[in-house]
From Swiss-Prot:
The lineage of its organism: Eukaryota, Amoebozoa, Evosea, Eumycetozoa, Dictyostelia. GO terms for biological process: mitochondrial electron transport, succinate to ubiquinone; mitochondrial respiratory chain complex II assembly; protein-FAD linkage; tricarboxylic acid cycle. It comes from Dictyostelium discoideum. This is Succinate dehydrogenase assembly factor 2, mitochondrial. Keywords: Chaperone, Mitochondrion. Pfam families: Sdh5 (PF03937). HAMAP family: SDHAF2. Its main location: mitochondrion.
Length: 141
């Protein structure tokens, strides 16, 4: 079978020498070709997340993990469906909304209480519309 580690590594397509690292897959699978990398320090993996994406993830988490189960369900379903569609200014408005006490948010989105002027935003209207239109997918009779 295999007599050395080098034979094992070469059989699985990964060869390591002192100066060169080659990662490759067979041309038969996915059309990949041999890739030579002389200096690994030149490789930069771009896995940074933009500030707007960080805000989206934060708001999605905060929408699903509230103090009231009702808000978890209503805001969580809204955020899951719509957070990627919101503009940066809408995200800022939504962030401000989520900083308010849960009972207030609940009453505002269900229109059970008057909404203060600073929270009368397009985002609140989107949330209200979402909550009015069967957000959890239950069928009404």
């Amino acid at each position: 079978m295999f007599k050395s580690i080098k034979q094992i590594k070469s059989s699985i397509g990964f060869i390591t020498t002192n100066t060169t690292r080659r990662n490759f897959c067979s041309n038969k699978i996915g059309g990949f070709t041999i890739k030579n990398v002389e200096d690994e320090s030149k490789i930069k993996i771009n896995n940074e997340i933009s500030e707007i994406e960080k805000l989206r993830k934060k708001l999605l988490y905060q929408s699903k993990e509230r103090g009231m189960l009702e808000n978890d369900l209503l805001l969580g379903s809204f955020a899951t469906l719509n957070i990627h569609k919101l503009t940066e200014s809408q995200l800022r408005d939504y962030n401000l909304l989520l900083q308010q006490p849960d009972p207030d948010i609940f009453n505002w989105i269900l229109k059970k209480a008057e909404v203060p002027e600073e929270f009368e935003t397009e985002v609140l209207k989107l949330v209200q519309h979402h909550c009015k239109n069967d957000p959890l997918g239950y069928t009404r009779k």
